[in-house]
Amino acid sequence: MMMTKILQKVANIWFGARNLAIDVVGGMHTQMMVSGALAFALAGVVPGTAHGGGMQPEQVSFPSLDKGKSGGALTLDGYLFKPDSREPLPAVVMFHGCAGAISVNTGRITSRFTNMAQLLNDMGYAVLIVDSFNPRGVKQICTVPLADRDIKNRHRIMDAYGALQYLNSRPDIVAGKVGAIGFSHGGSGALSAMDATTDAYGRSGQKFAAAVAMYPGCGWQSRKQPEFSAYGPLLILAGEKDDWTPVEPCRTLAVRSQQRNEPVELVVYPGAYHAFDSVSEVYVRKDVPNGVNGTAGVHVGANPAAREAAYKRVREFFHEHLGR
């Protein structure tokens, strides 16, 4: 009886919170609310399962190439979405942005990620969403200056290769047919995962078949020494008006790579800001210290035309390099 009352109270809190929640990019609060994470934790529900479309992710764990506080390999959290199939599947590793995999507003996997997972599942690919933050005790880094962040690009690269090794070891995944896709900070990780000069690539002994970087920050990669060198197909999708992760460093990187005949493609969507694939209207975030406008903030939000064009290009790209 007591447990029933507790669960009833949790349910009331959860559904009340849902009514107050507004799904915005980057986990920014527009109203005070009680997180739905408590309800999920008590009910034992994987945070992606409440999303529409019948998607039921398997919660998995696997080692990163990074070390944990104990000195051993850091164990990562992941959410594996798989279409029904009796045959092994190609797969795509997905990397979240600076707000993490789980929305602070809903307690669920952010809709941009589940929407992309659904698109890729419909193509016949398994999708592994990697949570790089929760295992490190970090909720978000959007509001943290670049120099002060505890999680940097090198951590995302090591997580990427941990995920790649994990998927290649599974009998239900086609080894060697694993791609990557990332958004914003995770887009930088996906981009860097294709860099043949990184330590993680050399240590892993494995390759991603192809990668998509959605509105990544390319500044560090465009300046690094030794120079970024793509070992496989890389597609960068960017917004023309992005003032959080501007397109010009990505253009520099792409042109330089193409001059070396490396398979790097850059697509720039006119009029699009950061996170153009979201469903939220464009608004200004003034709590972000890393954009090009200083204290004036950055623009984030949907551009429906760019979103649909990007989805189409992602389908074409992975069909070409992963099959199906």
Stretch-by-stretch model annotation:
Residues K241-T245, A275:
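Acidic catalytic loop of the alpha/beta-hydrolase fold
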